[in-house]
Structures are given as C-alpha cells and as structure tokens.
C-alpha cells in the first residue's frame, strides 16, 4: 500500500572520471518519513570533452530515508562516468 507515497527524482554527477567503485553519498531533496522502498539509477551521458570514452553503469548500492550512494561498474575498456539520473519511491 503506497498511500501518500513520496516520489523523487534527479540528476547527479558520478564523479566525472573513469574510477570504478562505490560513490560518496547523495542527499535526497526531501527526507522520506519512514522508508525509501525503491531506488532506480541510470547513466545519463558521457563527457563531450572526452568523446572516445563511454559510460558503463551505475547501480544503487545503499540507501536510507535521507541519502543514497551508487556503485560505478566498469565492464572493461575506457569508461567515463558522467552524470546519472535517479528515481526513488518511499513514504
């Protein structure tokens, strides 16, 4: 039951580098009162200053009612983690 659910979304920087690993924490614009039920993330773009590089993937890693972080996954080659979009549902 999602009566009075809170839906949030945004765009954040994934660090603008090719480093794989866990990111720092990102704050939700508004804290969820009791729980964040689900968090979805996807890469938005590559850096136009580095056109030979490509994005790999960001995965939701940990989240609380006030913040979250992601894991930047490199599948090989020459990655570049630019910005990513996120969507969260909670109460």
Question: Where in the sequence are the language-model features?
Answer:
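Extracellular attachment/recognition segments
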Residues: 3-91
């Amino acid at each position: 039951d999602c009566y009075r659910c809170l839906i949030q979304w945004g765009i954040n920087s994934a660090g603008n580098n090719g480093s794989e690993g866990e990111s720092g924490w990102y704050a939700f614009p508004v804290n969820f009162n009791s729980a964040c039920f689900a968090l979805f993330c996807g890469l938005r773009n590559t850096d136009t200053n580095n056109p030979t590089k490509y994005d790999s993937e960001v995965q939701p890693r940990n989240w609380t009612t006030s913040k979250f972080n992601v894991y930047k996954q490199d599948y090989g080659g020459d990655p570049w983690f630019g910005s990513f979009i996120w969507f969260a549902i909670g109460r």
